[in-house]
Amino acid sequence: MRLVCGGTAVVLVVGAGTAWFLYKQLDGNIRTDFATANELERIQAERPEPGPTSTENILLIGSDTRGGSGNSEYGKDNGTQRSDTTILLHLSGDRSSATAVSIPRDLMAHVPSCTQPNGTMTQEKYVQFNWAFESGGAACTIRTVERMTGIRVDHHLIVDFSGFKKMVDAVDGVEVCVPKAINDPEAHLNLPAGKQTLLGERALGYVRARYSIGDGSDTQRMNRQQDFMASLVNKIRSDGVLLNPTKLYPLLSAATSSLTADPGLDSLAELYELVRGLENTPTSAVRFLTAPRRPYLNNTDRDELVQPEADQLFAALRADKPVGVSGKVDETPRPVAKATAAGTAGTAAPTAPATSPAAVAPATEPVNVEPADAGGAEEDGKSRRVAGTPLPPGGEPTFPGTTADQDICGKAQ
């Protein structure tokens, strides 16, 4: 009996020690972004007020950096990086819903004067959105998003190419639906049409590919990313990953291996608490959509927000009100009538560019121009803040998008 008890004690001690070691290992993987926290503290007075009680607004940034382990194969590390993907994730106060809003990287935006890595200040510019991350890092990106939306960003997470691949591999791949066969030698991507499961390398090529798929627009690329994330969320939920330590550990290890977080989300305990808070959120209430946009009048390789739809979306999120999604954006290229044209509130599909981005090479430098239309925003000294656009009367605003319960080929599960 003593032997059994002693053996049990040894197992418990060793097991606890192993668990503690693994916890500390994962916890130590996460890099803390103190620089961004310090910069946001410096400009605290210009930031929006926090949202309603218990809501969380998290900015997810996919960096295209070529530095770091596993990223050099995607190009030369020239010391700069841009936000390849940026998503504003709103978690409702009661966690009954989660809304992920993609912000186009080529969206024209008012980027404030930001602190560069060398300590100098940039000038305020009206340029494509992803220039904010290149010039002033996460702090500049957060400030740009807050000015655009009027939403206080509570936390931010940055992940690179390597981290994305590892997370996909950790769940044994993610199922996608490919409408037409893809053969893209540059992206090392060769996929047949139909449903299939993609592992890390091919999954990364699939969500990043642009000019070789469809009409070459960033809108289609974001739609693919949203469908992919919806499929990933659905797989994690349906496989019971969050409740199974043997499945959860590889995912946490992958997620933390290339993760940079603000001081409020830089521990495994904080991240786990955040994720577990969504355990009872229905997949039908996990929504993915894109900020309402259309081609920018002065350069159809760029986008601009559609008003008043964009402000109605941001107003709903600020007030923690429900946002509906229905269908996908019409991606057929059409000429732009005029910059001030806007459709029915919330439900109109943005106009696509008259010239496909595949036919015109994208600019490599930021385009600093004046906006053709203020589009529902107002000037407040040097800072541009979102006007208090009211929500449309009668029911929730609805936008093109998808939910995590949708089948990858378009039918609700």
Question: Residue spans of the language-model regions?
Answer:
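Non-catalytic, solvent-exposed segments at the cell envelope interface
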Residues: 1-413
